[in-house]
């Protein structure tokens, strides 16, 4: 190595692990916006969406976001999630689109009356496809991470979808040296995952470092829950019918992941601060998605959902 190169290497600032992840995510977002015509960010209100939004605001500062946010509202999210969504949209002046499957709404589709598979298909997957078609979005940012679940582990950062929004694992493109192929045929679209290489721990460390607001449900507090099939389900409103002999009890719980409340299990916890959550995450030996009922809809359930157009 020459003296000049050695001097540069010794004096140039070294990026931390979080700084490298941040830079990678911002690069992915900017590249996607530059190479697509009508991008959108899928906003599910959870911790990953909060980090994704924070990164987007950094990526395009000081200007406004060059794309809207899209929330697929199943009408079964926790009340605190919806309140948080509306508050953040107002605080940040976001262009927020909220979409609910009108047919599913008219039919009264829900996780209690129709089960998790039908509810997820109609109110999430079909709703998402409808919204993307309605607004003609050709690229959608999502907050999925590879460490969450097996099918997500093998999906590329830039995921090609057919005109019907289906995912074919065999059509994935190579992404050597962080080079992303954003080309597509007419009618096709892309799902783009800037957080692919982040872990659950990375997310929490970044939230702490950047002081990112998150839904209070992530913090431990006393909440009314019932135990069903090994899961602590929070009784968030009167739509959750109690089974014979079932009585909600107050337990100190928090959520590692958030979805539709009858399909999302809480964990007993004392972690009421970010350092305590980080400590719990370091000690955890189970996936954060252990509380997602939809992941238990049979072997390969998530991969089938993704092939049909799920997030």
UniProtKB/Swiss-Prot annotation:
Chemical reaction(s) catalysed: sulfate + ATP + H(+) = adenosine 5'-phosphosulfate + diphosphate
Function of the protein: With CysN forms the ATP sulfurylase (ATPS) that catalyzes the adenylation of sulfate producing adenosine 5'-phosphosulfate (APS) and diphosphate, the first enzymatic step in sulfur assimilation pathway. APS synthesis involves the formation of a high-energy phosphoric-sulfuric acid anhydride bond driven by GTP hydrolysis by CysN coupled to ATP hydrolysis by CysD.
The protein, known as: Sulfate adenylyltransferase subunit 2
Alphabetized Pfam families for the sequence: PAPS_reduct
A GO molecular function held by the record: sulfate adenylyltransferase (ATP) activity
Record-listed E.C. numbers: 2.7.7.4
Any one biological process term the GO annotation gives: sulfate assimilation
The family this protein is said to belong to: Belongs to the PAPS reductase family. CysD subfamily.
Class in the EC hierarchy, top level: transferase
């Amino acid at each position: 190595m020459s003296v000049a190169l050695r001097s540069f290497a010794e004096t140039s600032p070294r990026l931390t692990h979080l700084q490298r992840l941040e830079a990678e995510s911002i690069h992915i977002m900017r590249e996607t916006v530059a190479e697509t015509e009508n991008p959108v960010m899928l906003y599910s209100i959870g911790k990953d969406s909060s980090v994704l939004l924070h990164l987007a605001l950094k990526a395009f500062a000081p200007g406004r976001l060059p794309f809207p946010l899209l929330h697929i509202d199943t009408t079964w999210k926790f009340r605190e999630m919806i309140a948080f969504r509306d508050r953040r949209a107002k605080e940040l002046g976001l262009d927020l689109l909220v979409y609910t499957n009108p047919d599913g709404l008219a039919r009264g589709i829900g996780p209690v009356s129709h089960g998790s598979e039908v509810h997820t298909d109609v109110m999430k997957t079909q709703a998402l496809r409808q919204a993307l078609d309605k607004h003609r979005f050709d690229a959608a940012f999502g907050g999925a991470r590879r460490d969450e679940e097996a099918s997500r582990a093998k999906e590329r950062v830039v995921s090609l979808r057919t005109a019907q929004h289906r995912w074919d694992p065999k059509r994935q493109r190579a992404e050597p040296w962080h080079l992303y192929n954003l080309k597509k045929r007419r009618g096709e679209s892309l799902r783009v995952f800037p957080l692919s290489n982040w872990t659950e721990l990375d997310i929490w460390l970044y939230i702490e470092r950047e002081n990112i607001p998150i839904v209070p449900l992530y913090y431990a507090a006393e909440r009314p829950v019932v135990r069903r099939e090994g899961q602590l389900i929070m009784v968030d409103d009167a739509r959750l019918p109690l089974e014979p002999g079932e009585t909600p009890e107050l337990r100190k719980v928090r959520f590692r992941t958030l979805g539709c409340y009858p399909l999302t299990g809480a964990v007993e916890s004392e972690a009421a601060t970010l350092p305590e959550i980080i400590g719990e995450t370091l000690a955890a030996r189970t996936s954060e998605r252990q509380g997602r009922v939809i992941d238990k809809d049979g072997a390969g359930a998530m991969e089938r959902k993704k092939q049909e157009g799920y997030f």
